[in-house]
Amino acid sequence: MMIARCSLFPPPCFSAVRIRCFAGETSDTGILFREKLIYLQDLNVDPHKALRVNPSLRSAPISSVVSVETLLSSTGLSRPAVGRILDMFPDLLTSDPESEILPVLRFLSNEISISEQDIPKSISRCPRLLISSVDYQLRPALTFLKTLGFVGRDTITSRNTVLLVSNVERTLIPKIEYLEEGLGFTREEVAKMVVRSPALLTYSVDNNLVPKVEFFIEEMRGDVKELKRFPQYFSFSLERKIKPRHRLLKEHGILMPLSEMLKVSDGQFNHWLLELRLRSAERR
């Protein structure tokens, strides 16, 4: 089982060689500090950024930093991936693997049933999981998401664990309320939408949902019921895809369901558009 591998018994490739390298036969703080900087650079972690964001790193023993890398690597993450995560979140460099990182890994494995093979995928896609409290963030978010229908075959997976780092009161509920009140959908209808398209819960209300709804209703003269059937509409760029394709269809007097209008590639869309224009010309 995954957690057995994460019990702070470092894999052979870490246990002897790397830690002994930095164990240091000197008490010279200057030398030890330089060794730490070299170690961070070897991980592709920016030492200056790390020290600025996490001042505690300056006095932390290098063995504690190595133990963090060891644990993360034992989940199956590659060393470059570990370095990228530690560079993004330097506070992890001085975290306690036993009390701060392992609880997150156990939560993913035991409470969400994410497989051992998918644990590194979850972490790579959403490194913020590692700095999130299980009790105050991850578990409350999971409980709320279950009420929306993220259970059974629709349960949270490694593809959408990013939802777990969203604050329920400040982030998730306002989006649900907008879809209910702004579009007139019931909670059940909204729940079906977000389960079909979980990314809906990651989009900004003001910067994504509102402008796309306004364009759909005011410019496209669309029926909001179509948004229920195709919630993926919100995942497409308004400026780069929705507006240009709508403009082309409007210019040629062609009506097309949202899913057909947006899901195909640019090449396929242009091919369809040409075919529709030719058929229209033949009918004349």
From Swiss-Prot:
InterPro entries reported for this sequence: MTERF (IPR003690), MTERF_sf (IPR038538)
Pfam family, one: mTERF
Gene disruption: observed consequences: Albino seed and embryo defective when homozygous. Developmental arrest of the embryo from globular to mature stages.
Record family assignment: Belongs to the mTERF family.
Entry keyword annotation includes Plastid: yes
Entry's localization field: Plastid, Chloroplast
Protein name: Transcription termination factor MTEF1, chloroplastic
Coiled coil (residue ranges): none
One biological process term in Gene Ontology: cellular response to singlet oxygen
Free-text function comment from the UniProt entry: Transcription termination factor required for plastid-specific rRNA accumulation and protein synthesis in plastids. Essential for embryogenesis.
A Gene Ontology molecular function term of the record: double-stranded DNA binding
UniProt keywords, alphabetically: Chloroplast, Plastid, Transcription, Transcription regulation, Transcription termination, Transit peptide
Natural source organism: Arabidopsis thaliana (Mouse-ear cress)
Residue stretch of the organelle transit peptide: 1-22
Cellular component GO terms, alphabetical: chloroplast
